[in-house]
Each structure stands twice: as C-alpha cells, then as structure tokens.
Design a protein with these regions (language model features):
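N-terminal metal-binding scaffold of metallo-dependent hydrolase/deaminase domains
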Residues: 1-46
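Divalent metal-coordination and catalytic microenvironments
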Residues: 8, 27, 32, 60, ...
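Short, small/polar residue-rich loop motifs at catalytic or cofactor-binding pockets
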Residues: 20-23, 49-50, 386-388
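Metal-associated gating/positioning segment near the N- to mid-region
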Residues: 49-50, 58-121
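Active-site-adjacent beta->alpha loops and helix N-cap segments on the catalytic face
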Residues: 89, 147-151, 216-222, 267-276, ...
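Metal-coordinating catalytic core of metallo-dependent amide/deamination hydrolases
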Residues: 109-121, 135-243
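Active-site-adjacent C-terminal substructures of enzyme catalytic domains
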Residues: 235, 247-361, 374-375, 399-400
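C-terminal cap of metal-dependent C-N hydrolases
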Residues: 345-347, 367-403
C-alpha cells in the first residue's frame, strides 16, 4: 500500500544528522515505511499522487514525525480533581499524599476496578493523545502496589495495545509509593521477591522503574529494585531528583538505565555521569507547571553533551495528554529552542525508550508515523500555546486520525 502526503508548506526531516526543513515537500510511505522525503516534485516523480492508494493534501501545513511520549502514567482509575483545588490553596504534593490522597487515592480506585474498566479508561486517554499527534507512548503501572493490582494494570496496557493505533511500551513501576499498610523495606521485599518475577515471567513489561525521591524510595532501596529488574531482563528507568537529591541520576548511570526522568534537582555532576553512560534525560515540564515549581534546566544536560527528551508525565496529578503542550512549556518555561523541543518530543523521546527502528524520525526507512499540523511552519506548534495544531495523524502509513 502506498500513501503520499503531498504539497506541504514544510516537511520536517528528522534523522541522525539533526533536523532539516524541506520547504514545499512531500512524503511517500510504502507498506508502512517511509520511502521518500523531499521536495514535492522529486517525491511525486517517483510516487505520483494519482497512483497512490491513500493521499493526504497537506497544502499550507507542516508534516513532522509522530510524537513519542516516553513517560506517562496513563493507566489508572478515578480522577483527582478535588486535589487540584487543594493545590491551588497551597497544599503540597507531599501533604496531600501523607493524608491518604495522591498516589494512594488512585491506588484504592485501581484496586476496585476490573481489568476491562482499566483498559477502557486507558483507551479513552489514548484517543486524546492520538488527536494531539502521539503515535508511540510509554505507559507505567504503579497505581496497584500489590502483585494482583500491578499485573492487572499491565494486562490492561497489553489489551489496549491490541486495540489502539498508538504503540504502547509497558513499564513496571511497582515501586511508585509505599502502600499505606506496609513498611518500606518490607514492601521492597514484595516488589523484588513477588511482583518482579511474576511480571517478567508473564512478559508484561519492557522496563523497570522506581520513584527514588522524598516520600518514596531511598537510593539503596531503588538500587535493589532496579538490580532485581535487570536480573529479570527488564531495562532500568528511574524517577530521579524531582523533589529531593538522592543521587538517582548517578544510579541510573551506574546501572545503564535507558533514562532518568524529572531531574529538577539535578547537578552538573549528575549530567556528566549520565553523559558518560549515555542515559537519556527525560524532562517533564507539565509536572513543574502542575506543581508550580521551577522547571528543570535543559542546558545542564545539553552542555554535558546529552540530548534532552520531553514527555507529558500524564497522570491524575498532571492532567495533560498533549505533547504539543509539553513542547510549548519546554520553550516558554525551560527556554528550549523550538527545534530542540521538537526533537525532544520525537527522536530523543524514542531514544529514551531504546527504540532503534527509526521511531521518532522522519527519513527513508523509518516507520510511516506522521503528524500533519495545520500550521505553515513547525515553530507555530510551541508558539501557539494551548491550541491543538494536529489535524491528521498517520500510523504506519494509515490515516488513524483526521479532523
């Protein structure tokens, strides 16, 4: 099957050499894979519109790679809108959780939900993500905090992945918080001895993550969990240096993690260690926005030679499914250049998920995952903050969303 997206104002080519804008460009996709990218006349000489099975007229619009969201908590039950008002009155994240709210509130809702209910709730969120241009997304567990509930969450992710165009990458985050009925070290024992073996044996996750921070898990507890994950074939990831500095970024470097995420309290030494080990920093500007705290500093990592990835951190406490909004916050809040933000939301986001098939790029041989944005140049996407610019989304060359 041949798909031709033709006559665009801009085609944003993204590959190992960086970002290159083709003015007046087209893209041809053959059997799900990008076959040609370039000026419209050149592409259509080999792939004429008249002979294509599917065509997308992108006149006046911009074509770019489908967004990759490398950090979400999109599978959950219940909402926490009441806590939104509490935060606006000055209550901290830690205060709310200490009173049984926050993560523990969502845990209660998840434990009361069926796998089918969790799957359907996730599918609804994925529909929103797709409308905003996301074509690949990581989804973490972590709102179960027991073997049965964590398995239920990851089984819901697997079932949703069978039904939805967005490719889902599952992450086990049993160490998201300490359950209300457990002592921290005893719960770590349960994660290591019960949850991890069961999750790995069922092939329900690719990554093992841990929340190494104040009110969650210590450095030593995090090490134990991630090393156990490695023993079971799961690549490590880590929530690090969000509220407190616990050397989580250096632990990520030591263990060869795919990414270290959040990093609001990271230091130049952390960035240097991550660079030495090629650990991708994943910055989550939506979280800083939701918590009303200072943003992470992307230059800390860029100066160390690292490429910065962006993610939504979509969860009940950071309720945005939009990578467009994440890019806008990255530019306006973290002062990232639009080109860096776009690569962070595509190419570098895919690197944070250890994807090596060309996902997140737009080049010959890459998956035919595209966004057609209703703007004349890509800089309008972060510039026009809060407005959805995505009009058409293609997955493997098939139109899966169109306004």
């Amino acid at each position: 099957m041949t798909t031709v997206v033709h006559g665009a104002s801009q085609v944003v080519r993204v590959d190992a050499d960086g970002l290159d804008v083709v003015e007046g460009g087209s893209v041809a996709i053959e059997d799900g894979t990008v076959a040609a990218v370039g000026p419209t006349d050149d592409v259509e000489q080999e792939y004429p519109v008249e002979g294509a099975d599917t065509t997308v007229d992108a006149a006046g619009q911009t074509v770019l790679p489908g967004y990759v969201d490398p950090h979400t908590h999109a599978v959950f039950a219940g909402e926490r809108v009441d806590e939104f008002a509490m935060k606006l009155r000055g209550r901290s994240y830690q205060d709310i959780q200490a009173e049984g709210g926050g993560i523990l509130s969502t845990v209660r809702a998840v434990r009361e939900s069926s796998c089918t209910e969790l799957r359907d709730h996730l599918l609804a969120h994925l529909d929103v993500m797709l409308a905003y241009g996301t074509t690949t997304a990581e989804v973490k567990s972590g709102y179960g905090l027991s073997l049965d509930a964590e398995r239920k969450l990851l089984e819901a992710v697997a079932r949703a992945n069978e039904r939805h165009p967005i490719d889902l990458v599952p992450t086990f985050l049993g160490a998201h918080a300490v359950p209300a009925d457990a002592e921290p070290d005893a719960y770590v024992d349960r994660v290591v001895d019960e949850q991890l073996p069961s999750i790995a044996d069922a092939d329900l996750a690719v990554f093992c993550d841990v929340f190494c921070d104040e009110g969650a898990f210590t450095h030593d507890q995090s090490r134990r969990i991630l090393e156990a994950g490695i023993d079971h074939g799961l690549t490590p990831k880590i929530h690090a240096e969000e509220f407190d500095h616990r050397n989580g970024a250096k632990l990520a470097a030591e263990l060869g993690a795919a990414s270290a995420d959040h990093l609001l309290q990271a230091t130049p030494d952390d960035a240097a260690a991550m660079a030495e080990a090629s650990v991708t920093p994943v910055l989550l500007p939506g979280t800083a926005f939701a918590l009303d705290v200072p943003y992470a500093d992307p230059t800390l990592f860029q100066d160390a030679g690292l490429s910065v990835a962006l993610a939504t951190d979509f969860n009940p406490n950071c309720y945005s499914q939009s990578m467009e909004f994440a890019m806008s916050l990255a530019c306006n809040g973290m002062r990232m250049a639009p080109a860096d933000a776009l690569r962070g939301a595509t190419q570098h986001a895919a690197e944070a998920l250890a994807l090596t098939d060309g996902t997140g790029t737009l080049q010959e041989g890459a998956p035919g995952d595209l966004v057609v944005a209703d703007v004349p140049r890509f800089e309008y996407i972060p510039y026009n903050a809060g407005v959805r610019t995505t009009e058409t989304v293609l997955k493997s060359g098939e139109v899966v969303h169109r306004d």
